[in-house]
Amino acid sequence: MPTEQMPIFALATGAGRAAIAVMRLTGAGCGDMLQRLCGPLPPPRQASLRGLWRRDAAAAPVLLDRALVLWFPGPRSYTGEDSAELHLHAGPAVIAGVADALVALGARPAEPGEFTRRAFAHGRLDLIEAEGIADLIDAETEAQRRQALDQADGTLSRIYDGWAARLRTLLAHQEALIDFPDEDLPPGVEQALLDDLTALRSEMQAHLDDGGRGEKLRRGLVFTIVGAPNVGKSSLLNALAGRDAAIVSAIAGTTRDAIEIRVVLGDVPVTLIDTAGLRETQDEIEAEGVRRALFHVKHADCVIAMFDGETVPDDIPADAIRVRNKVDLAPVPAGADAIGISVRQGTGMDALRTALAERARALTASAAGPPLTRARHRAAIEETAGHLAAALDMHWPEMRGEEMRLAMRALGRLTGAVGVEDLLDTVFGQFCIGK
């Protein structure tokens, strides 16, 4: 039997001490295996309490566990194949015993993402929806959960499928213009086709011009804290993280390398980066820390510029959030464009957290419609829009048709309809085993 059709199994629940472990099973012959393991198949999609037995020809049957068994006959299953779930007691010996019994019956352990890959192969979902499921598993916040669930439910796929259907119709009209140039076609057909192509390309461009908000929400933002030595950057990192993540010292230049901490601000995952103090130095190690600090400033989604006097550090982006620390020693002057805080006393920290949360939400909030969520999607749509732009510039009907066909192919790769074999290992390799 080809390996892609063999029955596979895997734990769908995490490792460690627990009451229940869920074992999933799918593939050709799954029903026969289940009957040898627990007797007659239970009614489809209904939980039944069954004894699970290891049956060897040379020995008496051995009871492995009493478990809830669910049977999902294909194609109405997650993978589209005959599938089952075994809700076991989660003891390591129980799990190992059932796994050994399944191997003896002809199943093999699943690879990461193999259940979802089979669902894709059987048309149960497309590549965009599969990636949405992966994002749903990884979601850390409510905002990420909503975005991932929309994608897994097909919200993005419906947009892209709609584009593909429109482009397919326009390509048919273009082929008619090529094949029947002397026929009495309705007047204005070619201009209407060009107008529709222009409108379709404009929709794609509007989808691309979203500021990368969906991608930023999916991966999380990066906020970099910068400032001169000893202004309280490490103390601020610790305060925002709620723990002592960075060493705090009165000695200037204590922080040499960047320190990264993951927090949630405004329901958005944010990586806070504490950097070396910005100053001229002859110390090679500290100078390297300063160079890395400037690198993180350049690549940050938001810069938190920290100071304890009236001078903001140089080379800071105009949209940086300016924070003046140690207001317990010198208050912020009236009208100053800075949030005044005292990390040591906690003064102003609520206002700063609010400002950071608002910035995080502003950087990830989608203005209208579901956003792009991956660089792969962006590249495919950019390629599609590029071919449409080339088609609009073509005066030869045959060349215009060829550009439209290339656009169809690029759009098909987006959802996995065409030419994505080289992508599948990358996409499904990101899943956990059991999904």
From Swiss-Prot:
Keywords: Cytoplasm, GTP-binding, Hydrolase, Magnesium, Metal-binding, Nucleotide-binding, Potassium, tRNA processing. K(+) binds at N230, S249, I251, T254. SUPFAM superfamilies: P-loop containing nucleoside triphosphate hydrolases (SSF52540), TrmE connector domain (SSF116878). InterPro entries: G_TrmE, GTP-bd, GTP-bd_TrmE_N, GTPase_MnmE, MnmE_dom2, MnmE_helical, P-loop_NTPase, Small_GTP-bd. Homodimer. Heterotetramer of two MnmE and two MnmG subunits. It comes from Gluconacetobacter diazotrophicus (strain ATCC 49037 / DSM 5601 / CCUG 37298 / CIP 103539 / LMG 7603 / PAl5). Residues 220-361 form the TrmE-type G domain. (6S)-5-formyl-5,6,7,8-tetrahydrofolate binds at R24, E85, R124, K435. Its main location: cytoplasm. It is an enzyme of class 3 (hydrolase). This is tRNA modification GTPase MnmE. It comes from the Bacteria. One of its GO terms (cellular component) is cytoplasm.
